[in-house]
Amino acid sequence: MSELSFDAPVWRHGKALRKGYTTGSCATAAAKVAELMVLRQHLIHQVSIVTPSGVTLCLNVESPHIEGQQAIAAIRKDGGDDVDATHGMLIFARVTLNDSGEITLTGGEGIGTVTRKGVGLPLGSAAINRTPRHTIESAVREAIGPARGADVEIFAPEGEVRAQKTYNSRLGILGGISIIGTTGIVTPMSEESWKRSLSLELEIKRASGLTRVILVPGNHGERFVREQMGVDTQAVVTMSNFVGYMIEEAVRLGFCQIVLVGHPGKLIKIAAGIFHTHSHIADARMETLVAHLALLGAPLELLTLVGDCDTTEAAMEHIEAYGFGHIYNHLARRICLRVMQMLRFTKTPPVCDAILFSFDNHILGSNRPVDEIAKELQC
């Protein structure tokens, strides 16, 4: 494994987690060492780069090869202890020296192609983001000097398969992975990078002309929208646990309608004013159900049963048995009220709707008729 010059771990929930480096750092290092091999005409087995964040990486080189004025080298991606679809794959650079004075950068096998607006790259270009483009070109220019030129191709033979485990297809990046990384370093389980990837999907939807968006916690919500609402899932964006953040991003981007769709296990937290729904931040599901059941006049016996439940599903069984299923419409209205309270200082707040569904894809409740909401979404 490559030696890192940033050994200090990141601590999460009492665990020491190892940092890693981005595909952008891999591509930069591969391009730099390939160019150096052309110039020196001998194989190099280790290369160092300075990342945009100022961290020095000393990385092992794999599959080095020289043929005249062209060289190929690979760096193995190491995501550290982060959950990363590209971890362990090889990122290659093929560099050909010329006398043009210009550096050209292209994406080859396994590097995605941009097919939609909104990711900050021209349509049809390789999915190599701006910061990696700059670091690759700077590293090559430093090696070859001001007069020479070079053609640089970044490729990743496993890229197309690995990309199926990423958000790329939803972002309109097809055929492979993206070469990304603004700092060059992967921070284990970085919440900010996760939120940013979700927000990017919102930006792409807005750039495509959509003005109404459906925010769901995960894949189950998207399936419900498709099967039970009959609405094009192009309008669906995953918000994960970051409800407040994604609502604020939707407002920033100018969406006129936000529809929150999900299972009560996630969405009822919003009725209590909880806008980060991960259980390690806040729970209060049973407390919220008990409070609103009490407001609807539920008997003490039901309140006690629900309060003692460990799961929302178990609580829902008691609610159904006692005939209080109308609580879900009440909760949906409360969710919308809480969202509007959060956005009370927004100059032009969007319309907010909420739909709750069961694990077997049945509608439990909504703030207004679901057919009415679906019709507006299809406009």
UniProtKB/Swiss-Prot annotation:
SUPFAM superfamilies, sorted: CbiD-like
InterPro entries: CbiD, CbiD_sf
The keyword Cell membrane is assigned to this record: no
Gene3D superfamilies, A to Z: CbiD-like (3.30.2110.10)
E.C. number: 2.1.1.195
Top enzyme class: transferase
Keyword Transferase set for record: yes
A UniProt-annotated Pfam family: CbiD
Domain of life: Bacteria
Gene Ontology MF term list: cobalt-precorrin-5B C1-methyltransferase activity
Protein name: Cobalt-precorrin-5B C(1)-methyltransferase
Species, as recorded: Salmonella typhi
Annotated gene: cbiD
